[in-house]
């Protein structure tokens, strides 16, 4: 494989999952890794959007062209980056709306190796604001809806992304006690992750940094995506 070849030749192999380079994601990872949320318990991710008919040329209607392979791979990579490695998945797919050869919607249950469990849903047939494309402001082609699309919860707090809105107890941790929110400022984000990704690439070539997303990271995310497709096919 490419990963094995790169290791054998002692060269770096990078994967273009640009969302990892987003300063919002970097701050979220710092928050999680610092233990501010406590022990992670569960997560929920949404990618709901509506793709117009002229989006679907022939290859996007084929078995390799659905939103799980095209879009969900980025969400899975971020969950791995923020929460940890994924141990098992169970998924359902549907093509009930577009009635094509490939799925238009899917839901996935995730179990992470650290004990966190999560859910994820994706559809390209829903008119909605809850997707990374519409909420992050990374790409100006997508109208920014200023909503969240990822939620990560722990024993001492929870976090919404990309709003960077955190929630924690004021006093005792109890559903009878008040909780408060704090939202970190998020600056103009247009194209920032792509330039940061290029900076990392240059620094890796110069021997100054390690890859933010290695070839092995890309392979691990791809293996999760393949497991999601297999689970939907065999019903396990």
What are these regions (language model features)?
Residues 11-15, 19-110, 131-132, 235:
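Predominantly a Rossmann-like dinucleotide-binding segment in NAD(P)-dependent oxidoreductases
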Residues 1-2, 27-28, 227-228:
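Aromatic/hydrophobic pocket-lining residues that form π-stacking "cages" and hydrophobic walls in ligand
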Residues 99-103, 113-196:
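NAD(P)-dinucleotide binding in Rossmann-like oxidoreductases
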Residues 1-12:
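Rossmann-fold NAD(P)-binding glycine/threonine-rich loop
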Residues 8, 161-162, 200-236:
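C-terminal helix-rich "cap/oligomerization" subdomain common to oxidoreductases
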Residues 65-66, 184-189, 207-212:
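Active-site rim elements
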Residues 22, 73-80, 192-199, 216-223:
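A structural signal for well-ordered alpha-helical segments within the folded catalytic domains
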């Amino acid at each position: 494989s490419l990963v094995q070849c790169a290791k054998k030749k002692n060269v770096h192999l990078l994967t273009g999952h640009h969302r990892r380079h987003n300063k919002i994601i970097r701050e979220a990872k710092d928050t999680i890794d610092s233990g501010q949320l406590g022990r992670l318990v569960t997560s929920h991710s949404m990618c709901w959007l509506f793709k117009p008919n002229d989006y679907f040329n022939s290859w996007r209607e084929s078995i390799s062209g659905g939103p799980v392979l095209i879009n969900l791979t980025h969400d899975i990579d971020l969950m791995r980056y923020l929460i940890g490695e994924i141990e098992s998945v169970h998924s359902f797919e549907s093509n009930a709306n577009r009635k094509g050869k490939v799925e238009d919607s899917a839901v996935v249950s995730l179990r992470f190796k650290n004990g966190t469990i999560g859910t994820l849903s994706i559809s390209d047939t829903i008119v909605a604001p809850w997707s990374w494309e519409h909420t992050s402001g990374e790409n100006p082609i997508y109208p920014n809806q200023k909503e969240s699309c990822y939620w990560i919860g722990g024993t001492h707090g929870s976090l919404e992304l990309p709003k960077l809105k955190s929630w924690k107890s004021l006093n005792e941790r109890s559903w009878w006690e008040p909780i408060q929110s704090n939202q970190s400022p998020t600056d103009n984000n247009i194209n920032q992750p792509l330039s940061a990704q290029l900076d990392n690439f240059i620094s890796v070539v110069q021997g100054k940094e390690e890859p933010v997303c290695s070839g092995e990271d890309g392979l691990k995310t791809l293996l999760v995506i393949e497991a999601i497709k297999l689970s939907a096919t065999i019903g396990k």
